[in-house]
Amino acid sequence: MVVTNACAPDPRVMRHAVWMQQAGYQVTVHAFDREEQHPMSQNHQGVRIMRYRVGRVPYGGTVNTYRGIRRFQRTVIRTLTHDPPALVYCHDADTLKIGCALKEAANIPFVFDMHDLQHTWIRYAAPQSRLRSLISGQMKQRMLSRARAASTILTSSTQVSDVSSRGFVQWLQHHGLDGVSIENRPLPPFGTVKTPSEKTWTVGFIGRVRDLKAFELLVSAVKTLQPHERPKIRVAGDGTASAKVRTMLMDEVENGTLEAEVSGAFSQDDLPDLINELDVMYAMYAPLRGNILQGALPVKMFDAAAQGVPSVVNDGCLMGDLAESEGLGKAVAWDDAVAVGQALLALRAEVVELQATGEREHQRWLAAMAEVLAFLQ
């Protein structure tokens, strides 16, 4: 398996790696330690994680990011050419070059797991930029061309009904490719289920902190509530916007308008305790991120629901359709601070239930991978 993050952790990557191991295969995850701060070799439930260091590389859509990923790709191709695997499992579009190179050189099959629409991220910092739009279009076409060589394509969302918003499966179909949705739902056992508090309450965002506008909306939404109704804001996670978000929230605390707590990166083992602090999960994103409208589903919505915590998400897209169809929370229009505030308040005492878990997704994965696994035998 190949992934361009440090896999420290990447729950989807490790979940699929463990499933491959349970199917009877030895699995090595080739991961890119961009910040060079994790063990270079690690074992997780029998899965080896091999981390590469090719110089410190920033996250984001910069030239240095692109060059760093190219160095990582070349290094992994050399490694796997020297010791060829039976299968290459490509996590996201920026690893497809590796799968295609091994297939061309040694006829090794590869699986493409499209977590996200990677080509949309380069436009995030400047969505009106013609240059970024051009580069994004080139990345998209390159991804589609390479994906056609995959033995199987997996992705992370599909529409919930014939009349709902589209997911990534439908996006692939629109571009002439077939994919199977394996959603990022957690596996039991789960952490402690939410117990509503009659006194104070907390709204949280647990995960990568990249979208400053989402936090600006959250602050505005909370400030539309009466002071005695306002929740504490809890943010946990690192990311490209984490410093700005921390500063913004601490300024509000200093001004006496909000109560907030901010912490940095956390491990997967910390997640249940973090969610246990919350009454409502905030999972809204600026729609200018193309993948939001095209079918992205926030993992934090599923993780929160597994512990009874409802979420507020974007409406007009798949995450809103799924949240409301499964009773996992409320969908609200982007940039309507009053509506977001009222949705948060309405969910304060709600306890939800995640009925479809990662166990269902495991069965879907086995069905989707059946032909590939049969070929390997």
What would you call each of these model-derived segments?
Residues 1-37, 41-42, 159, 183, ...:
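N-terminal subdomain of nucleotide-sugar transferases
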Residues 11, 213, 267-274, 281-302, ...:
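Nucleotide-sugar-dependent
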Residues 74-81, 97, 101-105, 118-119, ...:
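Membrane-proximal helix-turn-helix segments that form the acceptor-binding/catalytic region
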Residues 118, 159, 167-168, 175-192, ...:
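Short beta-strand->alpha-helix junction loop in the catalytic core
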Residues 154, 186-188, 194-223, 234:
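Conserved donor-binding/catalytic core segment of Leloir-type glycosyltransferases
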Residues 189, 335-339, 348-377:
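A charged, aromatic-enriched C-terminal amphipathic alpha-helix characteristic of glycosyltransferases
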Residues 206, 232-245:
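Glycosyltransferase donor-sugar binding loop
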Residues 244-275, 280:
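Nucleotide-activated donor-binding/catalytic signature segment of Leloir-type glycosyltransferases, i.e.
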